[in-house]
UniProtKB/Swiss-Prot annotation:
This is Tail sheath protein. Induction: Expressed in the late phase of the viral replicative cycle. Expression of late genes is activated by the viral late transcription activator C. It is found in: Virion; Host cytoplasm. Polymerizes as an extended helical structure around the baseplate-tail tube complex. During ejection, the sheath shifts to a contracted form, thereby making the inner tail tube protrude through the host cell envelope. Pfam families: Phage_sheath_1, Phage_sheath_1C, Phage_sheath_domII. Signal peptide: none annotated. It comes from Escherichia phage Mu (Bacteriophage Mu). One of its GO terms (cellular component) is host cell cytoplasm. Homomultimer.
Amino acid sequence: MSDISFNAIPSDVRVPLTYIEFDNSNAVSGTPAPRQRVLMFGQSGSKASAAPNVPVRIRSGSQASAAFGQGSMLALMADAFLNANRVAELWCIPQGNGTGNAAVGEISLSGTAGENGSLVTYIAGQRLAVSVAAGATGAALADLLVARIKGQPDLPVTAEVRADSGDDDTHADVVLSAKFTGALSAVDVRWNYYAGETTPYGIITAFKAASGKNGNPDISASIAGMGDLQYKYIVMPYTDEPNLNLLRTELQERWGPVNQADGFAVTVLSGTYGDISTFGVSRNDHLISCMGIAGAPEPSYLYAATLCAVASQALSIDPARPLQTLTLPGRMPPAVGDRFTWSERNALLFDGISTFNVNDGGEMQIERMITMYRTNKYGDSDPSYLNVNTIATLSYLRYSLRTRITQKFPNYKLASDGTRFATGQAVVTPSVIKTELLALFEEWENAGLVEDFDTFKEELYVARNKDDKDRLDVLCGPNLINQFRIFAAQVQFIL
């Protein structure tokens, strides 16, 4: 046999002359960047062309509208995601209707305008302005508002006018119906969101949400439809316990050492402080992050899509860098009076809920993004998986470690240290792997992902398995780099 382990050149060749093969095991230096693949759950509309529970690669908002129906939850989510992140490989998996009915509520318009102006209505965060002339009645404005709604097909609702059945001929109702049925088909309706917007004197507006409670669709078929493809990040619009439990089980299996197709889910819950706090302490998921928003002008699924778009892009660039101050482009913050106070946000961060703040330009930005993991199996406080950066960094370290071994030693022989073999032989020993891991740690350290090389080197243990001589066991303890989040100082001044 040759001293060199050839891959394709046989040792029993007699035909002249030259035989040259290529080996790419040493071609790559460093670690190739992992693909930023994202999966988005969401409901399609009645005019969807895409089959339910089957992932579809989406590259534009118009493609999403054609696949899932214009104004559907999933089409709006995909458009919001792509507006914030055009680098990611976005896949969408549609669900059909949930339980309940399509009724959203009624907008009541009445009275007579005493001045010229504009009636500015916001439905699901979309602005609908109607010109108002002095003397116009609420009933006339209802017709104009419905025309504006019908002219804005990206709205998640349809509208019809219902005239007053009583004696008030200035009054009419605008009846709103959702384009999909489920717990998230309810929408926010308000007037005059921005400064300077006022309802003309004499016009009376009101909104009455539909009674009853709808339910989300079951995502079990969609989870089965995910297959074995790895999705690094998942946009999860549903926050009901059965669906979150299904997703948690799937993510934990993918996170395990056999599957290694780890992913991380992002969701948003809109509600009161009490609702959000109660929800947070009811969960304990290290692979799910939830941001809480009170008084949200837009549907929660749009915030979830944008939050995941921003976070996934930033963490793909540097998994260890904190996400604080990153803006959520296009998302409308709650009114000032609806925003959580400092003490409320601090408490929510102990309840497993991520927080946001609003900068002076009126833009929503991430304040701190955490996982929903709070306690260990004994119920004691456990911050080990608190930060999303920990999950993202661990995911990258495992990916780069696995890639280094599969790239450099794809089909090597295994021998004990001290074995004498030719330099060109495809043989690996514990000391060879240990040297490779130390070199890899230095790459991690240079990238700002880990620290304390000396301790890592001292504690690194590489040995052949005593029961399986084809197996190499490694015990290593990388010290993950931390994030600069808190600065505390005491100024002892002198007069």
